[in-house]
Design a protein with these regions (language model features):
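Divalent metal-binding segments
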Residues: 1-98, 113, 117, 122-174, ...
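Active-site environment of divalent metal-dependent phosphoester hydrolases
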Residues: 54-57, 171-176, 203-206, 226-228
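Structural detector of well-ordered beta-strand residues that form the stable sheet scaffold
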Residues: 82, 166, 197-199, 218-220, ...
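Extracellular/periplasmic catalytic domains that process cell-envelope and extracellular macromolecules
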Residues: 74-76, 103-109, 190, 251-253
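Aromatic- and carboxylate-enriched substrate-binding clefts and catalytic-loop regions
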Residues: 194-205
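Short amphipathic alpha-helices and their capping/turn segments at secondary-structure boundaries
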Residues: 1-3, 93-115, 204-216
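Polar interaction faces of repeat-based domains
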Residues: 180-190
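Active-site-adjacent C-terminal substructures of enzyme catalytic domains
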Residues: 203-260
Length: 260
């Protein structure tokens, strides 16, 4: 602020921190995964979705894939894993698909799931990307991670190469951008059961809710966010916009496939 560092890192600036973090090796990954499986099994959980590829950005994703595959061969992967492939740019996506990976590739216990993208930030940090400025800070509309052109390119490439696409969207502006990218891809390469979707779907509009049904998008709603964000939503975006937040029942009643 005013040219002075505050010690706060937001969105892409976090790469400066991640790049200095310790780098686990494959055996360390195997130990962490095995311990996580045991914890999940203790609660009766037998399948999970995860997006591990950028948990340690300095580690090649094939090291992580190998860790899962070796655990499966050893009989220690006791939770069925669907790996949401978080790849941050078009170059990484092209390389990934070029190596033969896409949605559905794998075994009964470890499969590649959808391409996972992070579209914006969070409501609490005012980094969710909004069409209008924040109610309690009119100097910002939040932070988009991608431009429209970048989203268009990545969504189209994944779609035409057999990958489902799921994108984290909190704010309404980023949701408009993502819906536009998905609509363009579907018009260019029509596919009935595409299974593309939006994660969180927090701050919507009637137009966006209608688009979910029209394009047959899935909604990954994650209602646990209500525990925190419901207490700040009116402060952040005002009462009028708050009417179109967490409209999960509306989505379900309209026939949109939702999951938690």
């Amino acid at each position: 602020e005013n040219g002075e560092p505050l010690g706060i890192f937001r969105e892409n600036a976090l790469e400066l921190v991640y790049s200095k973090a310790l780098t686990p090796d494959k055996e360390s990954f195997k130990k962490m995964i095995h311990e996580a499986c045991k914890a999940l099994n203790s609660y009766g959980v037998t399948s999970a979705q995860t997006d591990d590829f950028v948990a340690f950005p300095q580690v090649d994703y094939e090291v992580l894939i190998a860790a899962y595959q070796e655990l499966e061969k050893e009989g220690k992967l006791t939770v069925k894993i669907n790996q949401q492939a978080q790849l941050v740019n078009i170059e990484d996506l092209k390389e990934f698909i070029g190596k033969g990976y896409k949605t559905g590739v794998g075994s009964d216990y470890f499969k590649i799931g959808p391409l996972k993208l992070i579209g914006d930030g969070s409501l609490g940090a005012r980094t969710a990307y909004m069409t209008q400025p924040y109610n309690d800070d009119d100097s910002t509309c939040g932070i988009p991670i991608y431009t429209q052109e970048q989203l268009d390119e990545m969504v189209e490439y994944a779609h035409k190469n057999g990958m489902h696409v799921v994108i984290h969207c909190i704010g309404d502006k980023i949701m408009y951008m993502v819906v536009e990218a998905m609509e363009k891809a579907l018009k260019k390469y029509p596919k009935e059961d595409h299974r593309h979707g939006i994660v969180h779907c927090q701050i919507t509009t009637k137009e966006l809710l209608d688009k979910f049904k029209e394009l047959k998008l899935h909604a990954y709603i994650q209602s646990i966010f209500l525990d925190y964000d419901i207490n700040i939503v009116e402060d952040r975006i005002g009462k009028e916009r708050a009417k179109y937040t967490y409209n999960f029942k509306t989505l379900m009643d309209s026939g949109v496939i939702t999951s938690n």
